[in-house]
Amino acid sequence: MSPLGRFSAVAQSRRQLNNVFRRFTSNEAPSVIVPGVRPIERIRNIGISAHIDSGKTTVTERILYYAGRIDSMHEVRGKDDVGATMDFMELERQRGITIQSAATYVDWHGTNINIIDTPGHVDFTVEVERALRVLDGAVLVLCGVGGVQSQTFTVNRQLARYNVPFICFVNKMDRNGASPLKALDGLRNKLNHNAALVHLPIGKDSNFNGIVDLVEGHALYYEGEGGLIVRKDEIPKDLRVEAEDRRQELIEHIANVDETLGEMFLNDQKPDVKQIHEAIRRTVVKRQFVPVLSGSALKNKGVQTMIDSVVKYLPDPSEVVNRATVKTETGEEKRIILSPERNNDKPFVGLAFKLEAGKYGQLTYFRVYQGQLSKGDTVYASRDGRKVRVQRLVRMHAADMEEITTAYAGDICATFGLDCHSGETFSTDQNLAPHCESMHIPEPVISMAIKPVNRKDADNFIKALTRFTKEDPTFRREYNQEAKETIVSGMGELHLEIYAQRMKSEYNCPVELGKPSVAYRECLGAPYKFHFRHKKQTGGQGQFGEIEGVIDPLPADRNTVVEFSDETFGNNIPKNLFPALKKGLDAIVAEGPLIKSRIAGIHVRIQDGATHAVDSTEIAMINTMQNMMRESFEKASWLLLEPIMKVEVTTPAEFQGNVVTSALSDMFGYTSELRSLTEGKGEFSMEYSRYAPTSLEAQDRVQAEWRQLHGIADPNEKGKKKKK
């Protein structure tokens, strides 16, 4: 049995990389590289996504090592205290979790793979959202023991939202109880995917030492230091029958959705290896099939084969249709398809998907969708037409930057000095003004009061809040005038705690966080018809506005937004006054009538009204809308909406009787309580699902607690005293 030693081209890749760039830190100037323009079919943009602790970052570390991007591997919670390359934040290394997405790229046998490693914790889900928005494919990492877990559902929804094709890598096959069949069952029955194994593990638990490649029909063993040598051999005798059965199952699942393979299957023709690979690629790109691979990143097994599958099965940028909205000469909007050609025949179009404060200023991450972007180019923001010059252009490798001169369609790059917001589209054509669809931003679910420990740190406190709220759209702040305190809102306790720790470590500003509170919303319980007249005469120019219509509660799937529509006929209310009405609505919904939480889930429909030629000014119409809403606070039926969370608790069977479901307000500090109830053996994860009305009893209790907190008397008690 002569081993066919196949090295993963590590030495060659390292030589190539060292010839074209050198990494630089904040203390040294970058060197410039001018790479050749790689063909579009040799580009892959992928994300590594998974439930927390499934091994995403370890998988990425192995990819970097086998591709020659790093010289040695380090673990997330390694004894050497170095930490994984992609977890470059100090807090990430301390906690052993990924907090923010990190970008890098590798060369794998002539294919450039741009990689974004994303967090697994639900509190940082916006990092996954903005990564998947700009990626063409993904690797979904599942734990061989846990299979499909709570956060897997969230990632699956995000993949579907952005129509991202993916392959599945079942990790941790060396652990006791690991099996790819559990993951396969979860993909099929929990996530409703057409999935099949393309790998069978060789050896169970700690004896796992290789895989059977069901497509190629041979065994692969990963040997040598760090698993660098991939040895090809015959399939072990005890696995040959199962391998044949699983291969047939694989072909059947593909044939169900692929016309070419389906015809061969019906005609009893056996497809060859090339035909199976091509069919897998066709169906993966169309999101009709999910191939399931196996391995153990920690034990250095299966990762090279997984990278090969990324190149074989996931789409290049030309195979993904990307669209933008532009305005025609008549002012109408139309959708255009962006060209993936890697040249400057068409104007540059790029999406700023992530902001990060660096030592050189704001770092803006871009996905180039069309044309090319070069250092020194002038680009225009589609939102407001402002003109910006690209002074520096870099590619990211975790915390390091490698300066480049030009980025082409399909590339992911970053630039400095671009004052913009996440989700903005830029173009080199001032007249094009394209708008790429932005990413989904989930609503915050908890709030905390926050203040600096020392008054002298007030300036740094404001700077930190301003920066963090700009970088992270799920981290929000507001100032409570009554309580005279700053309130921050986010996706969970960990989310807010991390920002508190970052204020201390990055701004030397220790802060105190108050008790968590639920981010309630206020909504109408039933439609409310209104006919409201605002009239004010003070000696000078008066104010006049009259509006008639209805406020409807929105359905459950849209109850986090406020909608406004003009349903008038004729010109009783001139069209140029509707922006003022909308402005008044946007301001008044910040505080509802129950506990001054934000109003959501309503649709204000203006059906008729009246105006005055002189007195119906912008401020008059703003006041008309706001006073109508204040009247509705008194007359309409209002409800509290609370966040409904999906909670997954993992605990030994003997402790299950002690673990019960709770309201979100009862889940604060639940980690400590669960550890106490389960002798430290229980774990739980929680993610936002939707907003729904509270019970009337809960609403009364929340209102009473809010009034007590703010020293406000119960209006019902006042009424009782008057009657006496």
UniProtKB/Swiss-Prot annotation:
GO terms for biological process: mitochondrial translational elongation. Pfam families: EFG_C, EFG_III, EFG_IV, GTP_EFTU, GTP_EFTU_D2. Pathway: Protein biosynthesis; polypeptide chain elongation. Its EC number is 3.6.5.-. The keyword Magnesium does not apply. Residues 1-24 form a transit peptide. Keywords: Elongation factor, GTP-binding, Hydrolase, Mitochondrion, Nucleotide-binding, Protein biosynthesis, Transit peptide. CDD domains: EF-G, EFG_III, mtEFG1_II_like. It is an enzyme of class 3 (hydrolase). It comes from the Eukaryota. One of its GO terms (cellular component) is mitochondrion. It catalyses: GTP + H2O = GDP + phosphate + H(+). Residues 41-318 form the tr-type G domain. It is found in: Mitochondrion. SUPFAM superfamilies: EF-G C-terminal domain-like (SSF54980), P-loop containing nucleoside triphosphate hydrolases (SSF52540), Ribosomal protein S5 domain 2-like (SSF54211), Translation proteins (SSF50447). GO terms for molecular function: GTP binding; GTPase activity; translation elongation factor activity. The keyword Signal does not apply. GTP binds at residues 50-57, 117-121, 171-174. Belongs to the TRAFAC class translation factor GTPase superfamily. Classic translation factor GTPase family. EF-G/EF-2 subfamily. Mitochondrial GTPase that catalyzes the GTP-dependent ribosomal translocation step during translation elongation. During this step, the ribosome changes from the pre-translocational (PRE) to the post-translocational (POST) state as the newly formed A-site-bound peptidyl-tRNA and P-site-bound deacylated tRNA move to the P and E sites, respectively. Catalyzes the coordinated movement of the two tRNA molecules, the mRNA and conformational changes in the ribosome. PANTHER family: ELONGATION FACTOR G, MITOCHONDRIAL (PTHR43636:SF2). This is Elongation factor G, mitochondrial. The lineage of its organism: Eukaryota, Metazoa, Ecdysozoa, Nematoda, Chromadorea.
